Structure formats: structure tokens, C-alpha cells
């Protein structure tokens, strides 16, 4: 199985986590999984989003790699240069492929490059994905949004996410020397994550922000009473999740939010808006605290039983993620 992606380590985000964990499960099951990633090419940082590196000199090298690997199935995970060239090679050589939709880049463009018409991005995304045999999307809510921008509903498959990886399986609590309750945010510190909505909430206790990004310096200066810890990973991150009272997820642009399932695996209740991603995760559950008012959502979450979070988290596994992925690939032999 070949996965072509513009997002992979050392990037830290939900796309990378999904592709890596899916591959790990498939490898354990005896499948051979290969990746075409940016580390195989010359790259430069994406303007206004430096963590993402744009690959150059990808054609005809992507085609040569596909030819050399001779995969039984090809999955194109991103719409960047690597994904675009892998798609082009497949179409040119009449090879079947699947794609997945991880990021609403049309919405990101509106935030970062408002001069570019959103319709252009929507048209590009629809054209990119509609040539695939199947399109894996994060949630049912996202499927409905993507129908509106022209993506073929008949090809879309809901592809859920896990959260039960590494240190998140059994996190160790630590003593955080801050006034309770402790409200934690984990993720990229950038405009599309809507962190300001969390920082402006009038909440008793302590707000902790974990992550890095272009808005970090500005927000630290603007909110000096809040605690900014920078980036943390693996056991240290899981311990901060487990030792906080509520995880606040203010994003309105994420297509799922793996940090949500990671928090639940640590027994930490979640406050969020009722938008695609959180809405799909919590629908019908007794730990659903979503509200259009983030402060109200946070106060509801504070009353949630942590054991209920741990129990609910069991339904989100990478084994299920890998199963859906494998069941929907399109073999070329």
C-alpha cells in the first residue's frame, strides 16, 4: 500500500498522526506500507505556515517512485505538490487511487490570504478529489459540507479517528502547581484554531496553552496571566492532559480534532463548539458539553465524570481507523 502525502514527520498535526497510526496498524497486520513524503525532496516553508514544508522538484520523481514501489493500492492523502503529482501519474497511467480529506484549506485561505476567492479553492478541491475511486472524510457533518462545495457524495466514506496511541493509553498524572480548575488547550497557536475565544473566556482558575505557532508571541504578550508552555509531546503531553480539569477546543475549522480523542483517553472532559468534528464525536453521548457559548461549555464539562470520558474514548481506536482505510482502498491488480 502506497501513501503519498505532503504532511509527515517532523510535522506534528492530525494528518500526520492519522497516516502514521493507520500505517502502524496495517504493518502489524502483515501489510507492506510505503510513504512518499517531503523528506524525499527539496522543500521550502509555506508562507504564513512555516511548519508545513512545500516540496519542489517532485515531477517526475513521484512517478519514478510509484513505478519502483509497484504498489497494489495507492492512497493520496493531501492536495499539495506530492499529492498532485501522484494523482497526475495515476490518471496518466490509468491507475486507481483513493484520497482523503483532512483540512479545509479553503477556509484557511480565507483567514491567511483573503484576497484569493474561496470559490477557486473549493473548485480545486472538488476537482482534485472527484477523480478518486473513493474519498475518505472525517465525519458525516464534513461530508455534508463537502457536498456543498461540489465533492461527489457517492464516493465519500466516513473515516473515523483514534486516540489510543502511545502514552495516551495509560497517562501518568502530575502535580500541576496552579490554581484549580485548570483549563488546557493543546494544538497549533494560530488564528485558524480560534484560541482567542478561549483566552477571552472569563473562567476561574488557570488557563494553560500547549503548542507553538505564529500567534504564540503575540498572545503571550496580550494574555500575560495565562500560562504558555510551548510544545510538548508523548508522555509529557499525556500527563498534562490527564492532570487538567477540562480540555478546551475552540476551533471551528478542524475536520475532526484528534486532540479531542486524546484528551478523552486521558479521562479529561472536553469543552467545544457544536461544529463539525466535536458535534460528530459527542452526538448522543452523556459527556456532550458542546455549546455556542464556550464559557457555558467549559462549565458544563467541569461537572463531567472522568470515568465516563475514559469509557466513551474506547470507541475511538486506530484499529477501526485502519480497518475502514483498508476496506476502501482500490487495488490495481
Listing of model-derived features with the role each one plays in the protein:
Residues 39, 141, 161-162:
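Carbohydrate-associated surface elements
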Residues 129, 231-232, 239-244, 325:
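Short alpha-helical donor nucleotide-sugar binding micro-motif in glycosyltransferases
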Residues 147, 163-179:
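Acidic anion/phosphate-binding donor-loop and adjacent secondary structure
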Residues 175-208:
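Conserved donor-binding/catalytic core segment of Leloir-type glycosyltransferases
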Residues 217-236:
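Nucleotide-activated donor-binding/catalytic signature segment of Leloir-type glycosyltransferases, i.e.
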Residues 252:
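Aromatic "clamp/platform" in nucleotide-sugar-dependent glycosyltransferases that forms part
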Residues 265, 269-272:
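Short hydrophobic beta-strand element within catalytic cores of glycosyltransferases
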Residues 302-331:
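A charged, aromatic-enriched C-terminal amphipathic alpha-helix characteristic of glycosyltransferases
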Amino acid at each position: 500500500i502506497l501513501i503519498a502525502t505532503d504532511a509527515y514527520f517532523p510535522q506534528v498535526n492530525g494528518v500526520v498522526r492519522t497516516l502514521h497510526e493507520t500505517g502502524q496498524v496495517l504493518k502489524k497486520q502483515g501489510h507492506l506500507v510505503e510513504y512518499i513524503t517531503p523528506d524525499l525532496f527539496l522543500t521550502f516553508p509555506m508562507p504564513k505556515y512555516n511548519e508545513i514544508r512545500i516540496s519542489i522538484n517532485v515531477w517526475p520523481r513521484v512517478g519514478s517512485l510509484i513505478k519502483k514501489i509497484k504498489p497494489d493500492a495507492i492512497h493520496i492523502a493531501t492536495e499539495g505538490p506530492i499529492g498532485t503529482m501522484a494523482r497526475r501519474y495515476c490518471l496518466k497511467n490509468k491507475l486507481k487511487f483513493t484520497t482523503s480529506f483532512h483540512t479545509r484549506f479553503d477556509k484557511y485561505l480565507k483567514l491567511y490570504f483573503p484576497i484569493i476567492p474561496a470559490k477557486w479553492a473549493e473548485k480545486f478541491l472538488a476537482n482534485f478529489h472527484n477523480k478518486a475511486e473513493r474519498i475518505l472524510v472525517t465525519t458525516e457533518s464534513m461530508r455534508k459540507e463537502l457536498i456543498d462545495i461540489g465533492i461527489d457524495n457517492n464516493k465519500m466514506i466516513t473515516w473515523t479517528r483514534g486516540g489510543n496511541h502511545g502514552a495516551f493509553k495509560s497517562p501518568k498524572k502530575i502535580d500541576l502547581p496552579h490554581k484549580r480548575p485548570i483549563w488546557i488547550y493543546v494544538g497549533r497557536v494560530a488564528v485558524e484554531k480560534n484560541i482567542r475565544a478561549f483566552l477571552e473566556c472569563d473562567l476561574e482558575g488557570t488557563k494553560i496553552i500547549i503548542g507553538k505557532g505564529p500567534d504564540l508571541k503575540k498572545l503571550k504578550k496580550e494574555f500575560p496571566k495565562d500560562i504558555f508552555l510551548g510544545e510538548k509531546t508523548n508522555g509529557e503531553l499525556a500527563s498534562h492532559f490527564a492532570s487538567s480539569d477540562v480540555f478546551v477546543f475552540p476551533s471551528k475549522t478542524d475536520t475532526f480534532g484528534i486532540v479531542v480523542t486524546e484528551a478523552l483517553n486521558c479521562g479529561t472532559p472536553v469543552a467545544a463548539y457544536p461544529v463539525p468534528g466535536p458535534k460528530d464525536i459527542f452526538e448522543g453521548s452523556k459527556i456532550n458539553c458542546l455549546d455556542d457559548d464556550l464559557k457555558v461549555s467549559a462549565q458544563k464539562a467541569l461537572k463531567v465524570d472522568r470515568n465516563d470520558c475514559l469509557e466513551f474514548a474506547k470507541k475511538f481506536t486506530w484499529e477501526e481507523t485502519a480497518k475502514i482505510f483498508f476496506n476502501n482502498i482500490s487495488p490495481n491488480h
